[in-house]
Design a protein with these regions (language model features):
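Non-catalytic, C-terminal membrane-associated alpha-helical segments of glycosyltransferases
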Residues: 209, 225-287
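Cell-envelope/extracellular polymer assembly enzymes that use nucleotide-activated donors
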Residues: 4-6, 35, 173
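Short aromatic/hydrophobic "clamp" motif used to bind/position activated sugar donors
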Residues: 79
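N-proximal low-complexity "stem/linker" segments adjacent to membrane-targeting elements
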Residues: 1-25
């Protein structure tokens, strides 16, 4: 069968019902044939699940490495990345994505609009700063990995996600590298994905990894003069958000020390042209 695009779903096998619904929402798409790749992260594949390709890792390799594994096993030029508990809402969504990517070959990534079971979009799910409505499409400086579409050419050019990040900040890191390579990131407000309402992760391990990874990506991607500005800005924001929790504050401190004392990511700083472009788009790489 000739496919129009690929879809990658990363799963740890703990939501079989939701995974089936995610796959069904892809299979129900009209006017497109989709190659589905399931990545079984840390477990043996369930080959009865409907997919063209099943790949797996014996241990939990993390979100970025898991999605990289899926992408490396796709065959098409456009790749949908979908959380295993998310569903495409309309049956023509992937056809419209195909048209979007065909209409502008400078788009590397499209971030889809996430709505919850009540049809609402959380502010943290809109990949831009400011009060601009979640219903307005446009270029952005970031995207949401579990409801996104990537052009394989751009993905391969920059090397996909940084696997060392394991959890958190991988989208920001990839966004910076995509923009620095001259590509666009587009928030498509009219292309909607339903995902159950969730609260921001506040447990200590997530806080630790997020802050450590912020420092790692800053040291890898930012011009030297911006590195301390970015780190100190986010130190202030993160501490302010977690003042009531001593465990969270300890996790921030540990992440700060770990991030400063290690640098696993290859350094390739943003050009000042890219910094200016990001600033014009409303999010300079200091926040």
């Amino acid at each position: 069968m000739k496919f129009d695009m690929s879809a990658v779903i990363l799963t740890m096998g703990d939501r079989p019902g939701a995974l089936k619904e995610s796959i069904n929402s892809i299979r129900s798409q009209e006017n497109v044939n989709v190659e589905i790749v399931i990545v079984w992260n840390g477990l043996v594949p369930n080959y009865s699940v409907d997919a063209e390709t099943h790949v797996h890792s014996d241990v939990n390799i993390g979100i970025p490495a898991g999605r990289n594994l899926g992408a490396s096993n796709t065959s098409e030029k456009i790749i949908l990345f979908l959380d295993d508990d998310a569903q495409l809402i309309s049956n023509d969504l992937l056809y419209r994505i195909k048209r979007l990517f065909n209409s502008d070959d400078s788009i590397a990534i499209a971030s889809l609009r996430i709505i919850d079971e009540d049809g609402l979009t959380s502010r943290r799910h809109v990949p831009r700063l400011g009060s601009k409505s979640e219903a307005i499409s446009g270029q952005t400086t970031g995207f949401l990995g579990g409801a996104s579409v990537a052009r394989k050419l751009a993905w391969d050019q920059v090397g996909g996600y940084s696997a060392d990040l394991f959890y958190s900040m991988e989208e920001t890191d990839l966004s910076w590298r995509i923009l620095n390579a001259g590509w666009k990131i587009f928030y498509a407000a009219d292309l909607q994905v339903e995902h159950p309402r969730t609260e921001p992760t506040r447990h200590s391990e997530a806080i630790y990894l997020t802050f450590r990874n912020r420092i790692w990506i800053a040291k890898a991607n930012l011009p030297f003069i911006l590195i301390p500005i970015y780190i100190l800005t986010w130190l202030g924001i993160t501490v302010a958000r977690n003042l009531s929790s001593s465990k969270a504050l300890l996790a921030i401190f540990k992440g700060f020390i770990s991030g400063l004392s290690s640098s696993p990511l290859k350094r390739s700083p943003l050009s000042w042209k890219t910094v200016a472009r990001m600033t014009k788009l409303g999010r300079p790489p200091i926040i």
